[in-house]
């Protein structure tokens, strides 16, 4: 019984420990506890060990002793400390928690803290065992309660238990400020001056705040108590949430923010001052200056940039023809030669220009958008260039002014108008980067290849690239006898009638031969193809075994297929008296009489031929692999029957050139390089030929294989019968001869490059460098007389107008001065006689010798602009002068005085005209180096860009095997598209057929005849009174 009790106590202890160990929640305390632990430790222990040793005694052994050490384990008990969790005093463990403990149980309540009960309603006393009616308490409930505000009195002591929100002995007081609830124990959490209700704790917020805890400001637009009032502020002004006073945003003022800042001020409180020029106001919020029309900038200091106008320069001028517009209102200010609201109307007619519209434009108007009404310069249509707009854009350029670079690849041309790529034959795609798909070729890859036997088609020309062992136009003919490989270019090395494989040249030996090249006979005892068969001859009775068919050569008096018998033919047996029944020259076994079949036969009586595919002795040899013939062979000899048009041991070769048909016994009759079909004899004509014998040239306007394609040449030009290439006149190019040479190129198919030595030349599409209009001479450096007179007349007319205006102004000033002078004389009552003196300059300035001079202001109007390859821009021949030359006479050495006048030309004007070059006749710059727009030309003389200009060699030799194919590499010679493109055929035909400008003999001396001319006449000269020329 005692052990059971001990076990139960131990279990209770364990459970209690487990319960304490799992305690959780409040009212748990920690304490230190001592406990014992048994530990095992080691110890070194000494001991004596007895032994024996030799000694002089009997028996001769003596004892010996020595001390040794050993390790032993021992156990001891030690005390340790540990921290344990346990319920604090007054609490006991229950269901894993520490709960209060009342020693006297609460009868009508519950224990809420150590030794304290919380009684149910209507009960009281330490143990909640007293119950009195409401309003009474004490022993026998004889005493009346005096609690206020719905408070409950304790039935035992009469103490008042106050309702929520009240306090005091009798619960007569509300909770002090900042507290609320039962026993006023809860603390208010209202913020920003808010007060809470003493019962519920609800916050009553101060003005300007809201929210359960008064922690939020009034929302925008609200203010006051409970944020119930609306703000009166305008323009996004904010009101003060407590008082409702408006706080204005920058740029606004007034009680309700209704007014902008006064002019000249801006920003928060309108305290910032504007700093704008031109009297411009500033923005009332940002202070940004609001510039008047025509001005811009942070402070309206800058005028509008070119081609802009209006407020903030936000409007774009829409004036045409480089006209400027008024910066304030956008009114167009037209350049000379233009009129209209937008300066879009020419003063002159479309083909006229000049001050009086008396000059005719030299532009090709079909390809010209504009002939400038003042200068006569041609503004070319998109895709056209040159001074007269007669040339399409040069290679690889397109678009307005030919400024854009084409992105076409692989020799393609591009449309000079929109840059669309016109692919060369064999290419496709937007930029011609994609090769034709297999099986297609030609322009736009529109043609289908007709190559056979695995041949590939060259995408540009459609030429068939034959695989090894094949040839002919369509790769439909095997290699001829004794040739093999790619293009049948290799020679076979097979001997002794061996067959040569046309693909790889391997040898197939005839029966009786072996070796890689069939150079060795079969060894003795072997025969047949590859010497694979063993001779069956009785070597005792035979002389030899034929290496070809295995036939035995018997000794004398011996016979039979294998030389096996000495009986006469047709008999067998011991006495050779039995008749042999074997057929087809077969023999009998001399003993048994069984048939020994001859080559090519089988069966009991040798009556059956070898099965298909076999032949020879005992039908053991297989027929050779036949390339172009019947699958079977002769059952006796193994010979094969080739298909029509083939020969060779294995029918591997077609008929030799010029032969066709069965056994290649028929003769071909094809002409002009036509190839004869080795099977049918039908002629396959080269491109450009037709007819059954290829003896007829393609009809007019047709070309190509079978004459199936039509020529597309313009102007009735002839096309080549082989490839359709048009034979163009000089100055034209393109597959249709419809493209004039681009700027800078000339001659046959535009193959020559212009390298004109000066700006007075122009590149003629047919003849190369020729003089520009208005120039003549070997070096094109002499003005034609009519051109010089016209230029001088116009310049003289301009000078006359200018001098007239100067004289009129001078005359008006003199009249005004005389009027003032005499007015003063009269007012002073004085009389004076005026003396006017005219002086004569007896020492006119020294003038350097000079033959003549040109004023080039208008001298370049009729010129064609040209981009030179390797030359500097030639300057005008106007020598810089400070005074006007009046040299005259036969040698231009005489000088004449012109009254008392000494006229000095404006130096800037002279320099301006002196430095004018052909790119801009009136450009002025202080530095002559800067004046040469084309001074740095990278391409030296003779340079040609291989990526742009490939020269086509029309005399390119043809190959022996493909004489009808020529690869076209020139970018200009690609087959043209039918797409719409700029056409200048009509005008350029006229242009190229025009005679070249006449060449006048070079004048030795040309001078103005100034002998009887004074300055007035020179200054006011008209076209009718032009100075004469002296020769």
UniProtKB/Swiss-Prot annotation:
InterPro entries: EGF-like_dom (IPR000742), EMI_domain (IPR011489), LE_dom (IPR002049), MEGF10/SREC1/2-like (IPR042635). Residues 940-964, 989-1031 are annotated as: Disordered. Interacts (via the cytoplasmic domain) with shark; this is required for the recruitment of drpr and glial cells to severed axons and for the phagocytosis of axonal debris by glial cells following axon injury. Interacts with ced-6. One of its GO terms (biological process) is apoptotic cell clearance. SMART domains: EGF, EGF_Lam. Receptor which is involved in the phagocytosis of a variety of cells including apoptotic cells, severed and pruned axons, degenerating dendrites, salivary gland cells, germline cells and bacteria. Binds to the ligand prtp which relocates from the endoplasmic reticulum to the cell surface during apoptosis. Ligand-binding may promote tyrosine phosphorylation mediated by Src42a, interaction with shark and subsequent activation of phagocytosis. Also binds to the membrane phospholipid phosphatidylserine which is exposed on the surface of apoptotic cells. Disulfide bonds join 29-88, 55-62, 87-98, 102-111, 106-117, 119-128, 141-153, 147-160, 162-171, 184-196, 190-203, 205-214, 227-239, 233-246, 248-257, 270-282, 276-289, 291-300, 313-325, 319-332, 334-343, 402-414, 408-421, 423-432, 488-500, 494-507, 509-518, 576-588, 582-595, 597-606, 664-676, 670-683, 685-694. GO terms for molecular function: phosphatidylserine binding; scavenger receptor activity. Phosphorylated on tyrosine residues. Phosphorylation is induced by binding to prtp. It is also induced by binding to the membrane phospholipid phosphatidylserine. Phosphorylation may be mediated directly or indirectly by Src42a and is required for interaction with shark. Isoform B: The intracellular domain is required for glial engulfment activity. Isoform A: The intracellular domain contains an 11-residue insertion compared to isoform B and is incapable of promoting glial engulfment. The keyword RNA-binding does not apply. It comes from Drosophila melanogaster. Induction: By axon injury which results in up-regulation on severed axons with levels reaching a peak between 12 and 24 hours after injury (at protein level). By ecdysone. By detection of apoptotic cells. This is Protein draper. Residues 17-800 are extracellular. Disruption phenotype: Embryos show no defects in early central nervous system (CNS) development but display defective CNS cell corpse engulfment. Increased number and volume of apoptotic particles in the nerve cord. Suppression of glial engulfment of larval axons which results in defective axon pruning with most larval axons remaining in the mushroom body dorsal lobe at 18 hours after puparium formation in contrast to the wild-type where most of the larval axons are pruned by this time. Failure of glia to respond to axon injury, resulting in severed axons not being cleared from the CNS. The chain crosses the membrane at residues 801-821. It comes from the Eukaryota.
């Amino acid at each position: 019984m005692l052990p059971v009790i001990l076990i139960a106590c131990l279990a209770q202890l364990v459970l209690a420990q487990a319960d304490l160990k799992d305690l959780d929640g409040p009212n748990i305390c920690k304490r230190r506890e001592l406990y014992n632990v048994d530990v095992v430790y080691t110890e070194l222990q000494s001991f004596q060990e007895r032994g024996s040793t030799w000694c002089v005694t009997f028996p001769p052994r003596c004892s010996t002793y020595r001390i040794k050490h050993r390790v032993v384990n021992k156990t001891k008990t030690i005390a340790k400390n540990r921290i344990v969790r346990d319920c604090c005093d007054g609490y006991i463990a229950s269901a894993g928690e520490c709960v209060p403990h009342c020693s006297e149980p609460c009868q009508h309540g519950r224990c809420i803290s150590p030794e304290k009960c919380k009684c149910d309603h209507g009960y009281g006393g330490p143990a909640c065992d007293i119950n009195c009616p409401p309003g009474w308490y004490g022993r026998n409930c004889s005493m009346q309660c005096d609690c206020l505000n719905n408070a409950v009195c304790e039935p035992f002591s009469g103490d008042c238990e106050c309702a929520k929100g009240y306090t005091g002995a009798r619960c007569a007081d509300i909770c002090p400020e900042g507290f609320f609830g039962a026993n006023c124990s809860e603390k208010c959490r209202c913020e920003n001056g808010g007060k809470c209700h003493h019962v519920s704790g609800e916050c009553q917020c101060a003005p300007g705040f809201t929210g359960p805890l008064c922690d939020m400001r009034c929302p925008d637009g609200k203010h006051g108590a409970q944020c119930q009032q609306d703000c009166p502020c305008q323009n996004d002004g904010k009101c003060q949430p407590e008082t409702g006073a408006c706080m204005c945003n920058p740029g606004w003022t007034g009680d309700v923010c209704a007014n902008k800042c006064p002019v000249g001020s801006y920003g928060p409180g309108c305290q910032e001052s504007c700093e704008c020029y031109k009297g411009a106001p500033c923005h009332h919020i940002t202070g940004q200056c609001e510039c008047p029309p025509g001005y811009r900038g942070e402070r309206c200091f800058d005028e509008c940039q070119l081609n802009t106008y209006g407020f903030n320069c936000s409007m774009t001028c829409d004036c045409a023809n480089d006209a400027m517009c008024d910066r304030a209102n956008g009114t167009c200010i037209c350049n000379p030669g233009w009129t209209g609201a937008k300066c879009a109307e020419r003063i002159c007619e479309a083909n006229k220009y000049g001050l009086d519209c008396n000059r005719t434009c030299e532009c090709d108007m079909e390809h010209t958008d504009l002939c400038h009404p003042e200068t006569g310069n041609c503004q070319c249509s998109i895709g056209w260039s040159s001074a007269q707009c007669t040339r399409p854009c040069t290679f690889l350029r397109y678009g307005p002014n030919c400024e854009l670079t084409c992105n076409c690849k692989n020799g393609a041309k591009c449309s000079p108008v929109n840059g669309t790529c016109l692919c060369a034959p064999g290419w496709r795609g937007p930029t011609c980067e994609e090769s034709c798909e297999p099986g297609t070729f030609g322009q736009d890859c529109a043609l289908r290849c007709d190559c056979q036997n695995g041949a590939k088609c060259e995408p540009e020309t459609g030429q068939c690239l034959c695989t090894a062992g094949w040839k002919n136009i369509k790769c439909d003919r095997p290699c001829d006898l004794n040739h093999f490989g790619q293009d049948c270019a290799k020679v076979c090395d097979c001997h002794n009638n061996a067959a040569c494989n046309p693909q790889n040249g391997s040898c197939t030996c005839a029966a009786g031969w072996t070796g890689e090249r069939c150079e060795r006979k079969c060894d003795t005892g072997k025969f047949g193809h590859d010497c694979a068969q063993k001779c069956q001859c009785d070597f005792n009775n035979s002389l030899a075994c034929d290496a070809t068919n295995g036939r035995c050569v018997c000794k004398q008096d011996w016979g039979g297929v294998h030389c096996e018998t000495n009986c006469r033919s047709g008999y067998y047996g011991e006495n050779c008296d039995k008749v042999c029944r074997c057929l087809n020259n077969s023999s009998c076994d001399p003993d048994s009489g069984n048939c020994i079949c001859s080559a090519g036969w089988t069966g009991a009586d040798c009556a059956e031929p070898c099965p298909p595919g076999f032949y020879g002795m005992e039908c053991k040899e297989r027929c050779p692999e036949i390339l172009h013939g019947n699958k079977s062979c002769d059952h006796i000899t193994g010979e094969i029957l080739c298909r029509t048009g083939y020969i060779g041991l294995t029918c591997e070769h077609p008929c030799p050139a010029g032969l066709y048909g069965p056994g290649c016994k028929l003769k071909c009759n094809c002409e002009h390089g036509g190839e004869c079909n080795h099977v049918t004899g039908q002629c396959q004509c080269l491109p450009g030929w037709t007819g059954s014998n290829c003896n007829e040239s393609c009809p007019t306007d047709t070309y190509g294989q079978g004459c199936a394609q039509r020529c597309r040449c313009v102007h009735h030009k002839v096309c080549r019968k082989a490839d359709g290439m048009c034979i163009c006149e000089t100055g034209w190019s393109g597959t249709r001869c419809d493209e004039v040479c681009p700027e800078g190129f000339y001659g046959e198919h535009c193959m020559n490059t212009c390298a004109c030595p000066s700006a007075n030349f122009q590149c003629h599409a047919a003849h190369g460098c020729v003089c520009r209009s208005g120039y003549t001479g070997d070096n094109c450096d002499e003005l034609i007389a009519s051109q010089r007179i016209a230029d001088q007349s116009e310049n003289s007319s301009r000078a006359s107008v200018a001098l007239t205006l100067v004289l009129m102004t001078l005359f008006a000033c003199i009249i005004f001065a005389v009027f003032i002078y005499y007015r003063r004389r009269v007012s002073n009552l004085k009389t004076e006689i005026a003396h006017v003196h005219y002086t004569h300059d007896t020492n006119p300035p020294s003038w350097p010798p000079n033959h003549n001079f040109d004023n080039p202001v208008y001298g370049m109007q009729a010129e064609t602009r040209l981009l030179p390859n390797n030359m500097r821009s030639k300057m005008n021949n106007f020598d810089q002068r400070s005074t006007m030359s009046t040299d005259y006479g036969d040698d231009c050495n005489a000088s004449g005085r012109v009254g008392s006048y000494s006229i000095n030309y404006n130096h800037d004007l002279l320099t301006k005209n002196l430095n004018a070059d052909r790119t801009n006749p009136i450009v002025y710059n202080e530095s002559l180096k800067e004046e040469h727009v084309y001074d740095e030309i990278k391409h030296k003389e003779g340079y040609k860009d291989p990526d742009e200009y490939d020269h086509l060699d029309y005399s390119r030799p043809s190959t022996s095997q493909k004489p009808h194919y020529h690869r076209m590499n020139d970018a200009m010679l690609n087959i043209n598209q039918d797409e719409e493109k700029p056409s200048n055929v009509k005008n350029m035909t006229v242009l190229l057929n025009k005679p070249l400008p006449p060449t006048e003999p070079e004048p030795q001396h040309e001078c103005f005849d100034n002998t009887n001319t004074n300055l007035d006449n020179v200054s006011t000269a008209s076209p009718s009174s032009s100075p004469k020329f002296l020769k």
